[in-house]
Amino acid sequence: MDTETVLYIVVAILATGLIGVGGFLWRKENNSKGGSFLNNLEWRRAVKHFGKDVVDTKPIEKAIINAPSAFGLQPFKVVVVTDLETKKKLRSVSFEQAQIEECQTLYIFCAIKDIDVRVEQFIDETKNEALRPMIKGFLDNCPDKIAWAKYQTYIALGFGLAAAAEKQIYSCPMEGFLADKYVEILGLNSNMIPCVLLAVGSESKDQKLHPRFRFGEDDLLIRL
């Protein structure tokens, strides 16, 4: 083996090693800056103000659509509001919370009152008649179908929040609004009940975030 060939092999080995080290350092740096799911959750804050820059909300919407729900029924609708004038009207019936108007996109999670209609729609779409007696049996024994549907909206909200954190998009889950006024302003039909909101958008340069606090696992988790 001549000298030139040996040098070529040595250079190739060194290059491969550098690429591997570089990849490791890149992963380490990105994980330390929010590259992992858990780090991104720790990064997340419920912001009170939003900036003017445009963010890509498609990942959030995809997460909401793909969030789990009981039987896969998704007994809710999500109203997506980007129109400024509409957001101003909604702010006036949301105790003047600034996020409503300042956010780029406001997601309004609405429970569906008539669950039976949703079940029929689900069976028609999935062609899975075997699920009908199971779902019907559950709903017939459900003490409060509307409350149950409302619970499902919070699951979808959680996945939307997680997706926003994953993309480091600023967000704020919200209650504190007059649901009947939302129905009126948005022209919703009587089968929809606004339950909870998710405001998303870009960072406000004037944002002042308070230190984050979470109870520790010894307090929050009860292990048996």
Model-derived features: positions:
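Acidic, surface-exposed loops and disordered segments
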Residues: 2-224
